Swiss-Prot record:
Organism encoding this protein: Methanothermobacter marburgensis (strain ATCC BAA-927 / DSM 2133 / JCM 14651 / NBRC 100331 / OCM 82 / Marburg)
Pathway participation: One-carbon metabolism; methanogenesis from CO(2); methyl-coenzyme M from 5,10-methylene-5,6,7,8-tetrahydromethanopterin: step 2/2
Name used for this protein in its record: Tetrahydromethanopterin S-methyltransferase subunit D
Catalysed reactions listed for this entry: 5-methyl-5,6,7,8-tetrahydromethanopterin + coenzyme M + 2 Na(+)(in) = 5,6,7,8-tetrahydromethanopterin + methyl-coenzyme M + 2 Na(+)(out)
Function in brief: Part of a complex that catalyzes the formation of methyl-coenzyme M and tetrahydromethanopterin from coenzyme M and methyl-tetrahydromethanopterin. This is an energy-conserving, sodium-ion translocating step.
Enzyme class, first EC level, given as a word: translocase
Species classification: Archaea, Methanobacteriati, Methanobacteriota, Methanomada group, Methanobacteria
The keyword Ribonucleoprotein is annotated on this UniProt entry: no
Biological processes per GO annotation: methanogenesis, from carbon dioxide; methylation; one-carbon metabolic process
């Protein structure tokens, strides 16, 4: 693989990952106590979990076309984040006894259902309303596509060296996981805590986050290229 193509693929994948993290609804500790909307965990942790699942499904398509690998990554990440949000809602509704609503909007942008009268006083919402669920699925898809693209590029580059097919796939997956974490953490710092999805005012920070991930991914791509073609492997 051409070194510039490798850097470009890693950069594009990193930007997709960083952008996708901004779509994922994360409420942190307050959400775990049903006092904020979103999944009750950290931004980087949830995004990385979805990304790792996407990398597993992308790696399962090793040897297929790049589009198939990226599609598999997207499906894996979407399933992981979708199941997480679904189970979370089941706990919020049937365990805690709260209605999935957001305090950031008066009506759900997708369903048009009123939100304000269902928000428990003293909270910022609870559960995962439809807009958060859809936003999370979009974020998972973007992250999975980005991770799959990075995996494919690294795998193609490593196959031309002394590695066998299994060795190339393993090293490519490890590299892809590292690059995924870098961009997930950068996006998490840019968000600065919790976010509900594309309807959250914090979503406006996505431009700055994408620029930061772009720079970090270019550096990561350049370092990866030096390692791959510089004799390390």
């Amino acid at each position: 693989m051409d070194p510039l193509l490798l850097i470009g693929a890693i950069t594009a994948g990193g930007v997709l990952i960083g952008g996708g993290v901004h779509f994922v609804p994360v409420g942190g500790a307050p959400a775990a106590m049903a006092t904020a909307t979103g999944v009750g965990t950290g931004t980087a942790m949830l995004a990385a979990g979805a990304g790792l699942t996407g990398l597993i499904t992308a790696a399962a398509m090793t040897g297929q076309s790049p589009l198939m690998i990226m599609a598999a990554g997207a499906v894996g990440s979407m399933l992981m984040i979708g199941i997480t949000m679904l189970v979370g809602n089941l706990i919020y509704v049937f365990g805690v006894g709260t209605v999935p609503v957001s305090a950031k909007v008066s009506v759900d942008p997708i369903t048009g259902m009123e939100q304000e009268k269902y928000v428990t006083p003293g909270t910022e919402g609870h559960g995962l309303p439809t807009v958060c669920f859809v936003s999370g699925i979009i974020g998972g898809a973007l992250g999975g596509i980005g991770g799959g693209l990075i995996y494919w590029a690294l795998n193609e580059a490593l196959k031309t060296l002394s590695y066998g097919a299994m060795g190339a796939a393993g090293v490519a997956a490890i590299f892809a996981v590292g690059i995924f974490f870098i961009n997930a953490v950068i996006a998490s710092y840019n968000i600065g805590g919790t976010i509900e999805g594309f309807h959250d005012p914090k979503f406006k920070r996505i431009g700055r986050g994408i620029v930061a991930c772009l720079i970090a991914s270019i550096v990561a791509g350049a370092l990866s290229t030096l390692l791959v073609y510089g004799g390390v492997f």
